[in-house]
């Protein structure tokens, strides 16, 4: 039979474990000290017998289902069922578990003893609605309706009366209205009663008026008409007007309209000739043009004479002639040459009336082919709408030019969400600038050009210095140079340059061919050959070099110095790394090979004072990890193991008890008096440190023997201090005699043993 757990037993049996009982803890009646406890006899049921019927006979027997044959239940039983027999007077536990309602007195609050938070909340609908503002509004509305109805009836009645009675009636009505207002202000309650009486006096027929005769239209001739002059208010301008508008490097004269709010650009008219915006530029270009060829001058003169009556810059299309553009050619010669005839400069014959600021075309005709400098696209930063972009927010450091679109390497927190540089496409940048920052689309190309120009500066061509062209000071050479053509000058200059370059070229080629073999000679390179190890390491030099002794010593000293320098540098580097790791919080770097028990305590003390929550120790052997966990327990910290095999280490964490409890230093001192040193098991120790911690082994000397050598040949004679020799001398032995009795003295010379390294000694032979 399976064992029954203790929580299935009664409360008394579960706690009764007497020492004198035969069945301890198994329902024994004895207590802890062996005394007997009287058990109360349990009745057949939990209901008490009573002669009082349940609910005075009005209710059924509650226990009839599980206790048939019983028809009476005492009041104590009912109280026990609903509220508990031994419950406190105001126990929330029993009141929540039982379905009863204690101290239910919602009507009488004084008689009820229950707290207000335990009483049920009841909502009762009011019989009357208390709204004083609503009543006042209703009264005022009724008063206004009666007053308006009386005025309408009186006005309609006065239409049919004589004109003489109208004045008296009006005075009477005004007096009556004033009296009514005084009465209303003095006695407001009386007006409420009069309103109901007035409403009852007015009949329904008096409320409506039927006009049987049509109303005659008034005579408009008798109405006087007055003409009122409108006074024009002076227009206040908050911005100071500047008659000169500067756009880039162009200045335009601007005029302000008197009545209209428009600003126009004044274009000067020089007589009947119409001003052209490029007239000055064209005249300067034509003024500076000249040709040295006389044939070209004659050809130009023929063209001018043949087309003198026609415009010089006439277009072949007939539509341009209809538009009214009439060009007149004019040409000025810069040189004082009378042979060249001047021609008139091209000018427009159509008048340009006005140029609007907003770019609208106000002049007549279809002059789309003409463009003014003011209509060209301005650079970024010359318009007010350009300042919606803060160049400090969008920092572009690089650009990748593409066939269709470009990519930008920029930093923008609003676009990217961080302060790092990222590559983004041009579409993403334009959408952000237009949608998010609000830059107009017409200014977008100017902004992109601004970014490109800031990253890729324009390279201006260098001015030619003509330093490679020889210039003579003599007047003869100057005259001859001016008389020759430009092509002859170039040929002469190139010949002079080539002659200077070729000077000494033959000698240079000869020298190069002479030393060509030595220049391209290859040398065999290999590492230095050495012998020995450590401090005994020396340079091995070939005897075929036939170097003298001084040179060999110099090479050996340099080689040894090189080795010492490398060792010092390596040692200094290791010392520097160790010094830096001593102040590190990482214990794997701080203790590269092992740690002392005092180091473990110091680490716990520093960890207790720091704000860190975790501390990881280096991997130790199982006993070392267990020691660290014991110390962590005495410091009121939580410890756990991480890793596997040789990489198992202990991690210490702080808990709530660590802050409010002090460490147990007595137990910590006991652990410190035990094992002192703990080495790491995840790395190998160097030989020097391994020899310091491990037991050194005795090293026996190695003896070398030679072929044919007699064993013990050089051994000294046994002296008189030897106790064995003294005993033999007492027995009658003398030096040089053999050992034995009389007649059998033995040999006087010992048998010699020779070393034979080329013999195998006695061995078993098959023969």
Swiss-Prot record:
GO molecular function terms listed in the Swiss-Prot or TrEMBL record: nucleic acid binding
GO terms classed as biological process: mRNA processing; RNA splicing
Cell compartments where the protein resides: Cytoplasm; Nucleus
Biased composition, class Polar residues, residue ranges: 42-52
Compositional bias ranges of the Acidic residues kind: 176-185, 474-492
Keyword vocabulary terms for this entry: Cytoplasm, mRNA processing, mRNA splicing, Nucleus, Phosphoprotein
Residue positions where Phosphoserine is found in the record: 105, 217, 255, 334, 343, 345
PROSITE patterns attached to this UniProt entry: G_PATCH (PS50174)
Region (Disordered): 1-60, 176-200, 466-493
Domain R3H positions: 594-656
Signal peptide: none
Comp. bias regions, Basic residues: 1-17
UniProt superkingdom: Eukaryota
Domain G-patch residues, every copy: 720-767
Claim: Membrane is one of the keywords in the record: no
Disulfide feature: none
Keyword hit for Nucleus: yes
SMART domains xrefs: G_patch
Any one Gene Ontology cellular component term annotated for this protein: cytoplasm
Function: May be involved in splicing since overexpression antagonizes the suppression of splicing defects by SPP382 mutants.
Family listed: Belongs to the SQS1 family.
Name of protein: Protein SQS1
Protein's gene: SQS1
